[in-house]
């Protein structure tokens, strides 16, 4: 048997906790984005991330690299039916969309689940049935000559900063 170096051990994720704030991702395919979101959860004190089954594997080498060690402190749970799992937590579910209410003019509940969708398709259609509301980060550039959207990891960072700012 060849020699193997163990960098660190991660416990198997157990039961999903129902913390006041839950962050969920739906269909994130870019490993760098997922790793960054894991790092953001760690930074803001969110100890678990709920992932749809079609989200990139959190143990992908690029995810681990982008998380900068936060993968050891944030539990990632992969679930088959994201909407059903979030509903069982008995708190409102909100989704990040391009046409939602501005996070700057909406009171963001500090006991809720917040869902961020895939980079190219957003939140999956079936999950919309579970949403109590939608939020967005408005562009401050006027006219049509502007970026089409934000990177999902950047949007998550802006959102969490605004949420915790109160």
Model-derived features with residue positions:
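N-terminal hydrophobic or amphipathic segments with adjacent small-residue motifs
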Residues: 29, 63, 111, 116, ...
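A generic structural signal for short beta-strands and their flanking turns/coil linkers
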Residues: 4, 70-72, 112
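Active-site/ligand-binding-proximal alpha/beta "capping" segment
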Residues: 94-147
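Structured adenosyl-cofactor binding patch, chiefly the S-adenosyl-L-methionine
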Residues: 8, 42-44, 58-72, 125-166
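A contiguous, low-structure linker/loop signature
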Residues: 1-9
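RNA substrate-binding interface of SAM-dependent RNA methyltransferases
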Residues: 8-9, 13-99
């Amino acid at each position: 048997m060849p020699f193997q170096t163990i960098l660190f051990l991660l416990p198997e994720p157990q039961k999903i906790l129902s913390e006041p704030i839950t962050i969920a991702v739906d269909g994130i395919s870019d490993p760098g984005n997922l790793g960054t979101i894991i790092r953001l959860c760690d930074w803001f004190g969110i100890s678990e991330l709920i992932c749809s089954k079609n989200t990139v594997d959190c143990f992908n080498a690029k995810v681990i690299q982008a998380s900068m060690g936060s993968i050891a402190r944030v539990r990632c749970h992969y679930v088959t039916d994201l909407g059903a799992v979030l509903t069982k937590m008995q708190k409102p579910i909100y989704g990040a969309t391009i046409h939602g209410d501005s996070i700057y003019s909406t009171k963001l509940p500090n006991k809720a689940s917040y869902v961020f969708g895939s980079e190219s398709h957003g939140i999956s259609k079936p999950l919309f049935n579970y949403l109590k509301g939608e939020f967005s980060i408005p562009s401050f550039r006027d006219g049509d000559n502007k970026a089409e959207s934000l990177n999902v990891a950047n949007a998550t960072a802006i959102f969490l900063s605004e949420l915790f700012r109160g």
